[in-house]
Each structure stands twice: as C-alpha cells, then as structure tokens.
Amino acid sequence: MADHDLDVSGYQCPLPVLKAARKMRSLASGDVLRLLATDPAASIDVAHFCAEQGHELLSEEQIDGALLFTIRKGLAEP
C-alpha cells in the first residue's frame, strides 16, 4: 500500500472530485490518497464520491483555509 497526494486547490465543483476519481483509478486497492481542496462544496462532494465508489473516507481536516481529505481506495469500484 502506498500514499499519494493530489492538490486540487483553486478548482471549483465538480473538478476536485473528477480529478480525484481519475487519480483513484490509477491506485491499487488499499492505497491512500490525500486530497487538498479549497472549494467548500468538496466536503459534501468527496463524501458522496467515496460512498458511491466504495472508497473509505478516513478523515477530513481543515488546514489553513483548505480541506484535507484522506481516502483509502476500496477493493473494487462499482
């Protein structure tokens, strides 16, 4: 398992989730993605994306006006 970072700061909905989805497709099951976003809507969008795609949202933190999501890739995408 590996950790990966993706900075989508400055992008507005739906681009943060679209970029996260593209990155997740390149990861192995169990890998972790740290996603940094500045769009407040990402809080809702990322949680929904994880639930729909079978990924685990490990944490959501606010850091210096940004949102940092930690996501573990699920075993299989629907």
Residue ranges and their predicted role:
Residues 1-7:
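Right-handed parallel beta-helix/beta-solenoid
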Residues 8-60:
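Amphipathic, hydrophobic secondary-structure cores in small proteins
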Residues 64-66:
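Short acidic/glycine-enriched loop/turn segments that link adjacent beta-strands
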Residues 68-78:
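Core SAM-dependent methyltransferase catalytic element
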